[in-house]
Amino acid sequence: MEGLFQSMSNPVPIQTILFRLKKYFSFVKFEHTLFSLPLIYSGVFLASKSIPSMKLLGLVLLAGIGARTAALTLNRLIDREIDRRNPRTVHRELPSGRMTSPEAAILLLFGVVIYGFAAYSISTFTFYISPIPLVIFIGYPYMKRFTRLAHFGVGLGLSMAPLGGWFAVKQSFDGLLPGALLSVFTLLWVSGFDIIYSTLDEDFDRRENLHSFVAHLGKERALTVSSWLHGFAFAVLAILFFYEIRAWIAAPLLLVTGALLYMEQRRAADVELAFFRINAVLGFAVFGMVFVGVL
């Protein structure tokens, strides 16, 4: 705990505080929130079809940050020994010793508390269902130890984002189909790009007997599975568009989303481009389609 807290009689220099904040943001990959926040707010606006209150938007943001912090910290803690053996991940904070497990546990607690507080502040309904994503976050890091379907565990975790935004507005399961379609799109999209990301660890996964489509099928066949998943993802998004949105002003953004999914497959060999940059833009394209289409 000494890494996170100092006594009041021993003030910490501002440079040290900034260094630690940078370390914690790097640890949880704070920039990856760009994947989830547009999807959360897509769920919000799809459900409300209007501009919600600033209070609700702020609480949704807080819940998203808390949930993302908890999810990434759980993943890093559960996989720390695997990461220590993987040349690609050995320099991460826990394997390298730049962060201790107690520090990570405190960060996990912080994320869970922030998430729980935000869910409770929105409504008792959202608070009661708030443990569901946490259970998924705990479970999916273990999936690659026994099933190649682990990619769908990652997708399922992020598919909670649009549902969370939907439930923050609706606070019931009534009329869930549009929110469910957005969630299924997210599940398929994320599972597909997780297969692309796993190509970085093809040899390591085989050596460690970890399960993935790439390790079981080989890179080319696994990327074929990824392309099919992204094709189905676009089909689900198109169904959502024609079923619920039906605003031609938003149609160009639907096409942009399809083009980005296609580009992600064409540039799958460049994981930095496909996984990080294209996906960040794609999330905002989906949000833009929903925002423009329902208001």
Give the location of each predicted region.
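Residues within membrane-spanning alpha-helices of integral membrane proteins
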Residues: 105, 109-112, 130, 134, ...
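Extended hydrophobic alpha-helices typical of membrane-associated regions
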Residues: 19, 232, 239-295
